Amino acid sequence: MIVGLLFFATTINYLDRAILGVILPEIRDNFHFGLPIYGTIQMVFQIAYAGGSLLGGRLLDRYGTRIGYGIAATVWSLAATLNAFARSAFQFGLFRTVLGFGESANFPACSKAAAEWFPSEERATAMGIVNAGTNLANIFGPPLFILIAFTWGWQACFAIMGGLGFLWLPFWFLTYRLPRHEGAPTAAGAKVTIREVMKYKQAWGYGLAKFLTDPVWWFYLFWLPTYLTDVRHFTPQQRGTGLMIVYSISAVGALMGGVVSSFLIKRGWTVGKARKRTMLFCAVVMPACTLGVMVQDARLAVLLFGLATAAHQAWMTNLFIAPADVFPSQAVGSANGFGVCLGGLGGALFSGIIPGTVIPHIGYVPVLMGMSCFYIIAWFLIHRMMGDLEMVTFELRASATLAHSSA
């Protein structure tokens, strides 16, 4: 039941996030959306996503997963709905800023819930199911958005998808509770701060890995629909079908990434060895899969894009759960928030500013091929800074002292 709630929330989260990129070819002429302006809109979304993650992680650790996640879902659902009333690029940017701020708490909340409800050998499988929600949104979202836009207008896309979040909220508040063995959050746990988390190299290893690899997913999410239209000359229907194929393959990767590492742990591998070996495989195959941007055959390109996103999702399923392996539960939200913050900043740079600036001049090939190599660098950072993903000895007394001195 808990995994189902997290899965559907993540699906709604990504539906709200993906709308603008999918229907951009239909609305950009009316709003004068050139690639630089679109890149700027996505940049401010990701900066807000980065900033919101710091507050979101703190909110989750202080008030608990149930309240913190509920507040975040309310904010992002309201922001998604407001996009229906946008009448200029500035207004889209403003509403996307609020959307990014609210959506940033999603994966810190899911990771914290997984840490509260599942033992270490089951967490990656649980997160793989939750992470598959991103792909469900991307499988069915594009053709659904295009159908709604051509039937009732693009505004209906934002209004309908935003409303789904409000439908989810009552189920969340009525259902989610801490398991009995967890009990209520402790006073010490409530005083954990991101500043305390940042003292540990493991947090920086996680954050830098997110900084390097999150932008690749953002790039596919925000720029692939435009690429298929402008470079591959897909019709709206072909674009919807192509994206459905890409993210169907991606969903398999999200599930398999969790299943494989969980299987290895149950076979006697350490948590660190199982997670890192799975991620190393993904890092090695990623550059080959990105060759879709270079092949001539459009069908082969779509297949390779699907394999690339599958490799990313298998990687990310294991990376998402790493803070729950390394930090105690009362610090997981803050650790995840720190990582999501750096991931958002990386996204603003590598999938916002740079693509919007350089793609009109050099095209998509150098950008995608360059980013596909980030995974190897990220893996070495994880290996050096996070070690075997063993639980750190967290000095809660230092957190309490810091909180008292700042009062």
Residue locations for each model-derived region?
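Conserved MFS/SLC helix-loop-helix module at the cytosolic interface between two early adjacent transmembrane helices
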Residues: 51-90
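Extracytoplasmic gate region of multi-pass secondary transporters
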Residues: 20-21, 201-255, 312, 316, ...
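Cytoplasmic helix-loop-helix junction between adjacent transmembrane helices
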Residues: 95-134
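Helix-breaking motifs and short loop linkers at transmembrane-helix boundaries and internal kinks
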Residues: 32, 64, 85-91, 119, ...
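A late C-terminal transmembrane helix in Major Facilitator Superfamily
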Residues: 324-361
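Helix-loop-helix hairpin linking two adjacent transmembrane segments in secondary transporters
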Residues: 130-174
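Residue-level signature of mid-helix packing/kink "hotspots" within the transmembrane helices
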Residues: 18, 46-54, 138-139, 247-251, ...
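Juxtamembrane intracellular "pre-TM" segments in multi-pass secondary transporters
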Residues: 179-207, 231
